[in-house]
């Protein structure tokens, strides 16, 4: 996740908790602002499902998340399932841009439930995050 004020981080913890309640094990979370991209890439190759969560920053993907996604493209990450969650109060655009970037990766799937958190987790987006957790859990548990 890429969080500016902590709200995207809170959404990441909320989603991880929902996944755990659904029986998903071995959940790993990383703050792209404080984790070297080499560790993120290593985990990307290890995992089958990756959730990209980013705040919108100047109508773009938060720079550290953008760096991570760029590295995935350069290293030809393939055959993964991605879930996308963006956060923004006025004009959340990070989700659309992350989707466009992931669509360039070979044999990768994007979950149908792309979610936007407007500032902070609340009733409506909490339900959307719970729906996303159900979709991810169903994919993982087959």
Protein language model regions, located:
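Cytosolic transmitter module of two-component histidine kinases
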Residues: 2-4
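Glycine-rich phosphate/diphosphate-binding loop of Rossmann-like nucleotide-binding domains
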Residues: 6-9
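FMN-binding flavodoxin-like domain, especially the glycine-rich phosphate-binding loop
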Residues: 13-33, 40-142
């Amino acid at each position: 996740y890429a969080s500016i004020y902590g709200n995207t981080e809170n959404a990441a913890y909320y989603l991880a908790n929902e996944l755990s309640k659904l029986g998903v094990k071995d959940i790993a979370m990383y703050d792209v602002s404080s984790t070297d991209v080499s560790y993120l890439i290593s985990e990307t190759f290890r995992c089958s499902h990756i959730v990209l969560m980013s705040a919108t920053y100047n109508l773009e993907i938060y720079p550290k998340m953008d760096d991570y996604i760029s590295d995935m493209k350069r290293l030809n990450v393939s055959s993964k399932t991605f879930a996308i969650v963006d956060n923004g109060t006025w004009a959340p655009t990070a989700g659309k841009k992350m989707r466009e970037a992931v669509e360039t990766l070979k044999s990768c799937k994007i979950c149908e439930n792309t979610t936007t958190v407007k500032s902070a987790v609340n009733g409506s987006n909490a339900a959307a995050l719970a729906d996303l957790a159900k979709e991810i859990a169903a994919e993982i548990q087959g």
